[in-house]
Amino acid sequence: MSLPKIAISVGDINGVGIEIALKSHDEIKNICSPIYFINNELLNSAANILKFTVPNDFEIFECGSSFNIKPGRVSKKSGKFSFVSFENAILYTQNKRAQALVTMPINKESWKKAGVPYVGHTDALGKYFGKNAIMMLGCEELFVALYTDHLALKDVSAKIKAKNLALFLVDFYNSSKFENIGVLGFNPHASDNETIGGKEEKEIIKAIKSANNRLKKEVFTGPLVPDAAFTKSSLKRCNRLVSMYHDVGLAPLKALYFDKSINVSLNLPIVRTSVDHGTAFDIAYKGKAETKSYIEAIKFAIKLCDY
């Protein structure tokens, strides 16, 4: 039986992505057939800096132009290349040439310098496919979906409306099939019965009721108190959570499971997973990059595509 084909965009070439790909290749080729979206000249330049040998079976899809790699630096050229790699990998997967897409980390500032009109991978995928892409991060022990992802904190409250949140919850259930999902509150202590704010919690309660009614079962509970939801005893009861705001969900997740967590884009017509870390410019090309999150992302992508 042939192995599933996985399209891998290499991320920001000035970061740790290509080091992780080269380090992990011998392991992941046993569970999938990876194809890396990079040109030969850039690949060899990166390998030379790392003092790595490119494996003979390291299959690439030639894309983008070459330039001088500047380890650990924000760069317009590296931003443009990381988007070209990503865009080609999307098309390759969309055209059924690969069963799933796995992305290495990009640098958002480099994308901005290059004129890329998206905040990040999830935003780009949602707009590309015309869908409300859902960002979910974590591992089997704990998954957290973000109702708002890369949105300034001052703008989050205005986004918490029952109608839109209910649609999000239903989409999240339909794309994840999790049966027990906790929805975190927005205010401290989930407003403590409206003694600390509370208008957001009112909307959350309405959304939970609406989503459960549409699904005709009690999938969602809440609003849960965020500072208690991540304790060991709480996670034994419910370890699939929805956070209204990026840091409320991801700070405890990364404190607990940083090394093994991954990023998954749900509610899309393709399977996409990613590492749950950034470009790590501080250790780029120093041989220190960890591979565990990437390997977990590959394994989860294979699981999702039911190959």
From Swiss-Prot:
Coiled coil: none annotated. Keywords: Cobalt, Cytoplasm, Magnesium, Metal-binding, NAD, NADP, Oxidoreductase, Pyridoxine biosynthesis, Zinc. A divalent metal cation binds at residues 150, 189, 246. It is an enzyme of class 1 (oxidoreductase). Pathway: Cofactor biosynthesis; pyridoxine 5'-phosphate biosynthesis; pyridoxine 5'-phosphate from D-erythrose 4-phosphate: step 4/5. Its cofactor is Zn(2+); Mg(2+); Co(2+). It is found in: Cytoplasm. Substrate binds at residues 121-122, 254, 263, 272. InterPro entries: PdxA_epsilonprot, PdxA_fam. This is 4-hydroxythreonine-4-phosphate dehydrogenase.
